[in-house]
Amino acid sequence: MAVTNALCPAKPTKHTPNQGAIIVALLLLLAGGCQWAASSQNTTGAQLYEQGQYSAALQQFQQVVATDPENADGYYNLAATNHRLGNQRRDPNLLAQAESLYNQCLDHQPNHVECHRGLAVLLVDTGRPDRAFDLMKNWAAQNPNYADPLVELARLYEEAGKSDVAKKYLEDAVQRDAGNSRAWLALGNLREQNGDLEQAMRNYQQSLAINNMQPEVSERVAMLSRQISANYESAVAAGQTQIATQPNFQSGTMTR
């Protein structure tokens, strides 16, 4: 049974000390119950969304924000579902609703990565790419030690066909936070697309060293390793290998 608003904590009123302690304990229990219910509803809604049952998913996500009005994921999920339906139906009202919900999500959680991404995509979808780039740049400026804004900004540039600019932002991202597995993964993916397979594999390995719960990245590393070995064997067979330079030499020029 869904948890209703009546079970969610409200602002406590003044009580005697003993009553206050009891009320605080009850409020903590109720808050935990609301958060658990919201999490369950988000999970159910996400499953319905993946199955293409968008109307049913919307109902679940609406229950999330009714149960827990501070739940940023609930607003994001509502926004993403309205966004999908708005694009499918070419309905500007649904897209406007999605934009409002994305902004509500960010009001509750200013560094919500998926919400920034979703809002940026919506702005591009509705003919406002400059606003999308401004959104990400402002987010990055407000969080100078946070790599995710740069990762998402790079993603926008890559989608706009500016891979060189995207690469710069991703290199900045791993400098900003060398412990961000998403940044290393994105940099590896871009380098793989550009044909720099050895460097891409190193970037993937760095991402895995930070977060080893990425089976798809492990598969990419294994595939690239095989491809690099095959390329080397082909080069040897074609007589294209080069003699390594001696120490203190660079391209045949002696250093001092």
Question: Where in this protein do the model-derived segments appear?
Answer:
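Helix-start (N-cap) detector for alpha-helical repeat units in TPR-like alpha-solenoids
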Residues: 38-39, 72-73, 113-114, 147-148, ...
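Structural signature of tandem alpha-helical TPR/SEL1-like repeats
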Residues: 51-63, 86-104, 125-138, 143, ...
